[in-house]
């Protein structure tokens, strides 16, 4: 088989773009907690000494947005000007308006209800925007995710853990990881390169202290969990030589700039829509979760080794305008039979997705860092494999 390398990256909770995502989702959760039908589209910009939140919201509740912002930044660990940012004293600016009534009328009263015929109440809610969304799954890991992004997220989570628990006390919140895996055909066989960039306190010796600590406490424990040749992998720690200035002081952060980190690490296609700060009436988010659910159940059912699912919507219309499956030649049944089974087993109208995945809950803060997919947490309903039997029955397996 042909050998090739594939690389994915992740970032920690202190990366400026991820701070922005976490703030946007914390605001969303606060609104959904009191008003599950809140319509929320909130964007965050964070830079040296300042956080600006803007967007469109329609809700019956009130939330103290400046307090939410400050609490989230302090929780992440930016609590001192010595670290380059202090959530207690930074400037906060909020510019929130209402959702456009032109958009709202299409969501509240779908095209089917106005121009066609409705067959149940799920036909009444239209998609919150046009667009295309992708979901993916493969059999490389127990979570049915590509291995490079799974490893990269595990390293980022571990990097945050050793900072928080004091194992490596001189680390600071900003950090990135990158993993290059060698494949033999479609099978991951060897860890080639690991890159870890972590913000740290001043005057830390890279060669004698930081690199050995990262290898011992972060990389080796994570790599040991996976059945992968890793005897001679290359480790690059802070390749610039120093990473003292980080977080919003080092780079401005924006909601929605880590969409590949949030999904499959580049292993699958992406429709372009970000997730954080959006309530589930926005199909950018809810349909991406639904297509992951579809893809994972297909692989879990043994109907394909790899599958990518695309769904597309027109704004204000309940039914998708298109559904497409790509199995890369790994399907165990005829592709047209598999597509028919998916349409029979899964209802991809926005209201049905929200119902089936129970998305009107304040669950989104936990999605906003370390990946929206592949983490089998109780609230991540799109990670369930609860339609396996129905899919098998639909294809006669």
From Swiss-Prot:
Stretch list, region Flexible loop: 99-109
Gene3D superfamilies assigned: 3.30.300.10
S-S bonds: none
Cofactor(s) named in the record: Mg(2+); K(+)
Binding site for K(+): 43
EC number per UniProt: 2.5.1.6
A GO term, aspect molecular function: magnesium ion binding
Binding site for Mg(2+): 17
Cofactor, how bound (note): Binds 2 divalent ions per subunit.
UniProt keyword list: ATP-binding, Cytoplasm, Magnesium, Metal-binding, Nucleotide-binding, One-carbon metabolism, Potassium, Transferase
Binding site for ATP: 15, 174-176, 242-243, 251, 257-258, 274, 278
Positions of L-methionine binding: 56, 99, 251, 282
Gene Ontology biological-process entries: one-carbon metabolic process; S-adenosylmethionine biosynthetic process
Pathway membership, UniProt: Amino-acid biosynthesis; S-adenosyl-L-methionine biosynthesis; S-adenosyl-L-methionine from L-methionine: step 1/1
Name this polypeptide is given: S-adenosylmethionine synthase
Organism (species): Thermobifida fusca (strain YX)
